Design a protein with these regions (language model features):
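Divalent-metal-activated hydrolytic enzyme cores
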Residues: 3-50, 82-103, 117-229
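N-terminal short beta-loop-beta anion/metal-coordinating cradle
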Residues: 33-74
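A glycine-rich, hydrophobic loop/mini-helix early in the fold
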Residues: 63-91
């Protein structure tokens, strides 16, 4: 099956930030924070105790703190192309281990977004060079859900559904990790959530993944703790 996508030719006007302006903006940000809380940076400098690990896409339009309304120190963030959790990616695996075992986060969120360029690229029959091994993981998601996706006749709707299914599969990959299984067995934490951000209206959508159900199903095969269900 071939795919072609047309999201319109109109492009929003870009406000390109001037390099020097960045440092002026930083000064304003510091002043605003101090005006709100004189001890803001003193408290921020002590340590971090985030309750959330956020695994999201590198897309410049999707920033965790903004869409969640969070402050610095509240979210531990990892971002890559198409919010992937790949077992041989030492970067994301190190982040998960640190967040779960050291920071003791209570929630792990995998957040995708509609109109994701990484997912779109994976659905395009084209050699992407160095990106091929990375995008193959998204194509694997399509293969796992081929019947459902092929039954969707509208290409844009099919594309959005793949975004959602990719989030679900990455949540499953999080649950497969030893760090998550070990701590959950001891403390019933962390809980894994799957979200999608709709760029067109700014809404966060909870895919309402049944964590306990997924964990039980996964541990039938991926049980790393040597315990019986």
């Amino acid at each position: 099956m071939s795919f072609s996508f047309n999201f319109g030719n109109s492009k929003p006007e870009k406000h390109m930030i001037n390099y020097k302006q960045i440092f002026e903006n930083n000064k304003k940000w510091i002043a605003e924070k101090k005006n709100t809380d004189a001890n803001f940076f003193e408290k921020l400098n002590k340590d971090q105790h985030p309750d959330y690990l956020y695994i999201g896409c590198s897309d410049s339009r999707v920033t965790a703190e903004d869409l969640m309304g969070a402050e610095p120190g509240e979210i531990f963030v990892h971002r890559n192309v198409a919010n992937m959790v790949i077992s041989i990616d030492l970067n994301v695996m190190s982040v998960i281990n640190y967040a779960v075992r050291h920071l003791k986060v209570k929630h792990i969120v995998v957040c995708g977004h509609y109109n994701c360029g990484g997912v779109k690229a994976a659905m395009t029959p084209k050699d992407m060079g160095i990106l091929n091994p990375w995008l193959r993981n998204i194509r694997d998601v399509y293969r796992l859900h081929k019947e459902e996706l092929n039954a969707i006749t509208d290409e844009h709707a099919r594309y959005n559904r793949l975004v959602e299914l990719n989030v679900k599969e990455q949540c499953i990959n999080v649950i497969k990790t030893a760090a998550v299984q070990e701590r959950y067995l001891k403390e019933s934490l962390p809980t894994v959530h799957g979200w999608v951000f709709d760029i067109s209206n700014g809404k966060l959508i909870d895919l309402e993944i049944d964590f306990n159900k997924e964990l039980k199903g996964i541990r039938e095969i991926y049980n790393l703790m040597g315990t019986e269900e």
